[in-house]
UniProtKB/Swiss-Prot annotation:
CDD domains: Trp-synth_B (cd06446)
Purpose: The beta subunit is responsible for the synthesis of L-tryptophan from indole and L-serine.
Highest taxon in the source lineage: Bacteria
Pathway(s) per entry: Amino-acid biosynthesis; L-tryptophan biosynthesis; L-tryptophan from chorismate: step 5/5
Reactions performed catalytically: (1S,2R)-1-C-(indol-3-yl)glycerol 3-phosphate + L-serine = D-glyceraldehyde 3-phosphate + L-tryptophan + H2O
N6-(pyridoxal phosphate)lysine modified-residue sites: 86
InterPro entries found in the cross-reference section: Trp_synth_b_CS, Trp_synth_beta, Trp_synth_beta/beta-like, TrpB-like_PALP, TrpB-like_PALP_sf
Entry keyword set: Amino-acid biosynthesis, Aromatic amino acid biosynthesis, Lyase, Pyridoxal phosphate, Tryptophan biosynthesis
Protein name: Tryptophan synthase beta chain
PROSITE patterns noted in UniProt: TRP_SYNTHASE_BETA
Source species: Pseudoalteromonas atlantica (strain T6c / ATCC BAA-1087)
Record carries keyword Heme: no
Cofactor(s) recorded in Swiss-Prot or TrEMBL: pyridoxal 5'-phosphate
Length: 395
């Protein structure tokens, strides 16, 4: 690997202030060098295996699908150390930070999962972590805030704007503009300016690679579809990457429909957005007629982002991937169903993918194999869901 493409079709690019371009160029070169360095790869794989717990399991659902001739598998990223897929690429970027000779890490977080992953990687590798989090998210994700602080990270609440993920990204980028000589901005999703979408995809690629090997071992063939939730789109691109060149495998991303796509309260950037630039990349974003960024909404803090990674925008445009949307209510139902039927409490983000996969399974032909990326576990969401349901679960 000697060069990275900065765009996916028309999407992507590096739309940032000029003073950040040297930092992004340095990051791209460090990543290319690392990808070609067997020692870096060895250290990364050792951390993934011995610290994070890869490979993660693939579980056949026993009780969710009514048709016994349709198989629904769960790729268990919820079992990864840190509680979600986020740990994969954070370990990779933290190693890159050290490789560049930097001592500090800046990050943004929504649900707090990326923040937790950043905090644990920085604790392990001796880096100082500053994590920006929307004030609203600090309130609804209190356990993760305490986890981050417990592991030595500084958590900075952001009151600007709507006090959510978009605003946290703005503050993190502002910080990085002033400190990039000693700090690395550890972006948490497959969005943002080049080279972030490519780096994040490559550091999550093992999700799809393991899925391929596991399904071949269990079924002797590739799945008919892989399904993953999409906010910025990192867990989905990690799942999709190894299957993009396999036309027999449907790639299905699931966006948050919130209170319904007919309302203003959703986060479906591909489903309802238009093209534009946000956080350094050209992609589908939620904006009004004047180009002002609209507030995204989802019951799940981690999907509450008003744009989508540029490779997803491209996969949508060329028809290689399909993007559906699932409402809060559908996701909450799937959250409870998996808990009650299988004893696995999924993250609200992952519950969106599960809800859509269950609908697919209901309509699927005999012999269909579907894999859902269970991107995280639901511990962080228990208090939030408890308050929504008023302590009642839907029997």
């Amino acid at each position: 690997m000697n060069h990275l493409e900065s765009k996916f079709g028309q999407f992507g690019g590096m739309y940032v202030p000029e003073l950040l371009i040297p930092a992004l160029d340095q990051l791209e070169q460090a990543f290319i060098d690392a990808q070609n360095d067997p020692e870096f790869q060895k250290e990364f794989m050792e951390l993934l295996t011995d610290y994070a717990g890869r490979p993660t399991a693939m579980t056949l659902s026993r009780n969710l699908v009514s048709n016994p001739n349709v198989k629904l598998y769960l790729k268990r990223e919820d079992l990864l150390h840190g509680g979600a897929h986020k740990t994969n690429q954070v370990l990779g970027q933290a190693l890159l930070t050290k490789r560049m000779g930097k001592t500090e890490v800046i990050a943004e977080t929504g649900a707090g999962q990326h923040g937790v992953a950043t905090a644990l990687a920085c604790a392990l590798l001796g880096l100082k972590a500053r994590i920006y989090m929307g004030a609203k998210d600090v309130e609804r994700q209190a356990p993760n805030v305490f986890r981050m602080r417990l592991m030595g990270a500084e958590v900075i609440p952001v009151n600007a704007g709507s006090g959510t993920l978009k605003d946290a990204v703005n503050e993190a980028m502002r910080d990085w503009s002033a400190t990039y000589d000693k700090a690395h901005y550890l972006l948490g999703t497959a969005a943002g300016p080049h080279p972030f979408p490519t780096i994040v995809r490559e550091f999550h690629r093992m999700i799809g690679e393991e899925t391929r090997a596991q399904i071949m071992a269990k079924e002797g063939r590739l799945p008919d579809a892989v399904v993953a939730c999409v906010g910025g789109g990192s867990n989905a691109i990690g799942m999709f990457a190894d299957f993009i060149d396999e036309p027999s495998v449907q790639l299905i991303g699931v966006e948050p429909a919130g209170k319904g796509l007919h309302t203003a309260e959703h986060g479906a950037a591909i489903g309802k957005g238009t093209t534009g630039i946000l956080h350094g990349a050209y992609s589908y974003i939620m904006q009004d007629e004047d180009g002002q960024i609209e507030e995204s909404y989802s019951v799940s803090a981690g999907l509450d982002y008003p744009a989508v990674g540029p490779q997803h925008a491209h996969l949508h445009d060329i028809g290689r991937a399909t993007y559906a949307a699932v409402t809060d209510d559908e996701a909450l139902y799937a959250f409870q169903l998996l808990s009650r039927k299988e004893g696995i409490i999924p993250a609200l983000e992952s519950s969106h993918a599960l809800a859509h996969a269950l609908n697919m399974a209901d309509e699927a032909e005999d012999g269909t194999i579907i894999v859902v990326n269970l991107s995280g576990r639901g511990d962080k969401d228990l208090a939030h869901v408890h308050s929504i349901l008023g302590g009642q679960t839907n029997e």
